[in-house]
């Protein structure tokens, strides 16, 4: 608990009751929030489904001022395993209307999550947050997308919030929270050696895959 609240504090969506939030050594309370938001990208667990909009607009809405090309949209979709040429799901390609309105295409929960992730790929922010947006996506596909995000985040800052510890392994720094407090931090290997909360959760999850 407390992980989503922490991510929203870091984005400046919440104001801390005590203490301060700094990014690059600067207190966010004295930072131009418009500038901060333009440099920040986030995909939350409770993402918005933009119905009555085309597939293309669903991706572009994350960065409306970015120069539009069909190739950029198609790339973001393909990195999240969505194919604009899938005639069954997207009969009009990038111009397919989504949602029940206007006889649009109705996506599954996993497809909506992939689309939300595609918006994150398209935005190309300096500071990215992924707050468990992949609960309806299988672990292997989730791991692939997170690793791709890690590539995009090279030289930038990315925060991934997840309960699937297999995905946490790709991080160069893991922070473990329990009851709203930070209880451990380190790399995957360091935390396993310490035999603390992280190691306990890792072993519990791993046991579910051992026959």
Report the location of each language-model feature.
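ABC-fold ATPase nucleotide-binding domain signature/coupling loops
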Residues: 73, 83-115, 208-211
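A short, proline-enriched helix->beta-strand linker immediately N-terminal to the Walker B motif
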Residues: 122-126, 155
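Helix N-cap at the start of a conserved alpha-helix in ABC-type nucleotide-binding domains
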Residues: 139-141
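C-terminal portion of ABC ATPase nucleotide-binding domains
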Residues: 147, 154, 169-211
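Helix-to-loop junction immediately C-terminal to a conserved catalytic motif
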Residues: 11
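Catalytic Walker B motif of ABC-type/P-loop ATPase nucleotide-binding domains
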Residues: 128-132
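Conserved ABC transporter NBD signature motif
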Residues: 19-27, 36
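Conserved catalytic motifs of ABC-family nucleotide-binding domains
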Residues: 47-68
């Amino acid at each position: 608990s407390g992980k989503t609240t922490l991510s929203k504090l870091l984005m400046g969506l919440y104001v801390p009751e005590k203490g301060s939030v700094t990014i690059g050594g600067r207190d966010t309370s004295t930072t131009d929030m418009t500038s901060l938001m333009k440099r920040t990208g986030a995909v939350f667990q409770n993402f918005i489904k933009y119905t009555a909009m085309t597939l293309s607009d669903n991706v572009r809405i994350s960065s409306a001022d970015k120069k539009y090309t069909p190739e950029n949209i198609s790339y973001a979709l393909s990195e999240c395993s969505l194919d604009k040429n899938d005639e069954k799901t997207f009969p009009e390609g990038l111009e397919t209307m989504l949602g029940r309105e206007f006889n649009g295409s109705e996506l599954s929960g996993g497809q909506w999550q992939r689309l939300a992730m595609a918006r994150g790929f398209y935005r190309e922010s300096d500071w990215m947050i992924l707050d468990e947006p992949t609960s309806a996506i299988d672990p292997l596909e989730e791991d692939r997308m997170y690793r791709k995000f890690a590539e995009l985040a090279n030289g930038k800052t990315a925060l991934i919030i997840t309960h699937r510890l297999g995905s946490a392994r790709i991080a160069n720094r893991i922070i473990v929270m329990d009851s709203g407090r930070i209880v451990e931090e380190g790399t995957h290997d360091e935390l396993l050696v310490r035999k603390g909360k992280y190691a306990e959760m890792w072993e519990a999850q791993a046991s579910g895959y051992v026959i």
